[in-house]
């Protein structure tokens, strides 16, 4: 067992919409590719403040969050398109406490994309209950 790191591509969903409507060029879509630590104890995709600023994501709300060092009011941002391997979702992201905390891939992202952690190979893989295919739950 060890640390599982995965590449994540994050795009500003508002920019994607603007490019689709012809308001901006596709190469003007703000995006960042990062390596993030898979952390099944975290809820959201958690990003350093400088990455959120670079992406230009919209503030949604602040919420109390339990961390290993106590409870903090952290900010949630909307308008992120998240791609890991060949799967893409749109969801809110959480801002890390500071820029020194690494990006984290939380369990909500894993569940929405139907990924499971393979600790032996230090990677994520498609859910074996669904033969590795991306299958969503309705109930």
PLM-predicted stretches and their roles:
Residues 1-139:
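Pepsin/retropepsin-fold aspartyl endopeptidases
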């Amino acid at each position: 067992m060890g640390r599982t790191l995965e590449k994540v591509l994050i795009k500003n969903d508002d920019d994607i919409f603007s490019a689709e409507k012809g308001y901006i060029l596709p190469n003007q879509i703000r995006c960042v590719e990062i390596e993030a630590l898979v952390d099944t104890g975290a809820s959201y995709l958690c990003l350093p403040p400088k990455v959120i600023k670079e992406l230009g994501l919209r503030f949604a709300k602040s919420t109390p969050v339990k961390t290993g060092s106590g409870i903090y009011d952290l900010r949630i941002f909307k308008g992120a398109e998240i791609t890991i391997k060949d799967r893409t979702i749109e969801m809110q992201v959480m801002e890390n406490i500071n820029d020194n905390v690494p990006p984290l891939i939380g369990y909500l992202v894993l569940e929405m994309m139907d990924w499971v952690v393979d600790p032996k190979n230090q990677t994520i893989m498609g859910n074996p209950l669904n033969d590795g295919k991306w299958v969503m739950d309705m109930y």
